[in-house]
């Protein structure tokens, strides 16, 4: 019967004791092996990061060659120039630049009101039109 149980369970009988709360076998070199494994993982990670940095440097070099060839600017440089242009006041102008004026502000509303008033005045008889225009 013992033979049949061992064959049915395979090598799981050794692990059964561990699963039921028994003590694990103590490996005298387990801590040393774990440290070696951690060191190997750390080295692999460093190598991966170094490889990634080299590849990114090569890509940036190619990007810069393309920018130089076609006279393009980096996105950050372009944004900085646009921002500086907006902040710099126009020479001889006492007003803000048009882009700095928020939408809905300014003379647009007054023009709409005047056009509505003009439309209403057109439908009034002549003497009333004269009264409202004064």
From Swiss-Prot:
Interaction with the SNARE complex: annotated span: 41-97
One term of GO molecular function: SNARE binding
Tissue expression: Nervous system. In hippocampus and cerebellum, expressed mainly by excitatory neurons. Down-regulated in brain cortex from patients suffering from Huntington disease, bipolar disorder or major depression. Down-regulated in cerebellum from patients with schizophrenia.
Phosphoserine PTM positions: 93
Gene3D superfamilies: Single Helix bin
Residue span of region Disordered: 1-114
UniProt cross-references to InterPro entries, sorted A to Z: Synaphin
Coiled coil stretches, renumbered: 28-84
Keywords of this entry: Cell projection, Coiled coil, Cytoplasm, Differentiation, Exocytosis, Mast cell degranulation, Neurogenesis, Neurotransmitter transport, Nucleus, Phosphoprotein, Synapse, Transport
Chief subcellular location: cytoplasm
Gene Ontology cellular-component annotations: calyx of Held; cytosol; dendrite; glutamatergic synapse; nucleus; perikaryon; postsynapse; SNARE complex
Subcellular locations according to the entry: Cytoplasm, Cytosol; Presynapse; Nucleus; Perikaryon
Disulphide-bonded residues: none
Annotated GO biological process: cell differentiation; mast cell degranulation; modulation of chemical synaptic transmission; nervous system development; positive regulation of synaptic plasticity; regulation of exocytosis; regulation of synaptic vesicle fusion to presynaptic active zone membrane; synaptic vesicle exocytosis
Homology family: Belongs to the complexin/synaphin family.
Subunit structure, interactors included: Binds to the SNARE core complex containing SNAP25, VAMP2 and STX1A.
PANTHER family on file: COMPLEXIN (PTHR16705), COMPLEXIN-2 (PTHR16705:SF9)
Purpose: Negatively regulates the formation of synaptic vesicle clustering at active zone to the presynaptic membrane in postmitotic neurons. Positively regulates a late step in exocytosis of various cytoplasmic vesicles, such as synaptic vesicles and other secretory vesicles. Also involved in mast cell exocytosis.
Protein's name according to its UniProt entry: Complexin-2
Organismal lineage: Eukaryota, Metazoa, Chordata, Craniata, Vertebrata
